[in-house]
Amino acid sequence: MEELSLENPFDPENAEAVSVKESPEMLYDQMLTRGEELLQKPLRGGGESRVRVQHSKGRMTVWERIKVLTSSEPHITFQNWGSELDGAGIVTGILNIDGRDVAVYGHDFTVRAGSMDATNGGKIARQILMAGEHGIPLIGMNDSAGAYVPAGVGGLDGYSEAFAAMRKISGVVPSIMLMFGYNAGGGAYLPRQGAFVIQPEDTFFGLTGPNVVREALGENISADDLGGPKVHSKSGVVDLIAPDELGALRSAMRLLSYLPDNNHSTPPVRSTSLTLDDYVEEEAILLHKTFTNPVSGFNTPFDMRLFLQQLVDYGDYFEIQQVRAKQLTTAFGRMGGNVVGFIANNSAYASGNIDTEASRKGAKFIRFCNLYNIPVIFLEDVSGYAPGSEQERAGVVQAGRELLDAIVDLRVPRLTLIVRNAFGGAYCAWNSYHVGGDFVFALPSARIAVMGPAGRQFVYKDEFREILQKYQQDLDSGTAEHDAAVVRDTAMVKLTARYERELLNPEEALRLGSVSRIVMPGHSRKVLGNTLCYLLRHYQPSAMGGPQRE
């Protein structure tokens, strides 16, 4: 046992003895060395062998992913870990991405497969809450085997703490979640609480993996068919897919460029040399070619994304949920440097009819824009909601109500341009003046009515009845059925043309004030862009009253 000394170490006579043992300078150097070790320990992760395994799977380490997001030195927060590596599987930090502060968390799969314990859950929760308190966006890089089994209930508590934190910042700051590797259980729930989820190819996430499904249900299914990007992109569980991890990270950075820091601010305005006042000849050519098609004419399927391309700066837009419900396009773009959320009917798919999936897709996008002060432009070409027993069983009435509610609740600047069809209840709900639209414009090709061409039999009842009676009389008099049908169909075509000429146009809507003005082809960008600038000059960004979630 070491003897205790009662000598004063600061006595000049004892100075030599102190220096021989451990001088204050030596102790300080030791502290610096230990501090450097602690600082560098997270960077080493699970060691070189674990890193090689990660690379052999075609996956980056969490530190390599961070380097893709920023060229600046990351400010790492919450470096804590326990004696049993508790907490070491999570990296948290603040990154400078294009001059903006962004909170980031990422699983380090080289340490205990990025599994969740109580310490990890606390680290993630603190990082998430800090993003909300400081009003900065959050990016999550998920690559975890799930709860750490030896941690017992501590791993589950870790997820619970992170779940609660994610819910608290929902609607306060935007969040982007990236799915790397294989994530199950809580590792699937947590990222889906985010505003946007991006999943690259050759990854999986779901409630349970294929082995559990096989044991529980006897169903043999691959991980890709159970929880791969093709499955989740169609259902709307993921918002974007990418070919690989690098593509996913770049998509996250591009998406971030359209998003504000928080619900009190507006998205970044990007300076541009483009003017909003130019005539866009490509738009006029596109509409002319579409609506003068010699075969289908005004019934030509029209991919609205081609039209959207003529409106946005440099023809560049960023589509969200591109695979799900293709008859409805949701995208971010810029006009005059200002970020806009576009929601457009796309008759190139399912005739543009709004079904259950399209309603929920649109409602989610509109709610997000409303929360984060992003103006919305509706491009309308809709003949109605999808009919049929299948849609009724799927809950189209409830889903349609969700879409309608989201549109009515909009408090951000919102415009509508009727490109072609605007029929019935779909017209009523699609940001008309009477549900709160700031301005409603129409191209000369707009057809606004209670019903489409089928409405001829209700407007021209006598003429319609006479055509059918003439057909029956011809048959009774011995006219061949084919010849009688030709006469009938020719008369019906003329009656339809009359209906379209007299009623399927914007004139009545313009007279009633349901449309504020006609926009000529080639001038849509000018009218929409300048009107948007006017509205934004008088819009004060703010959070919505009360707790509002995404």
Region locations from a protein language model:
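Ligand-binding clefts of soluble mixed alpha/beta catalytic domains
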Residues: 1-550
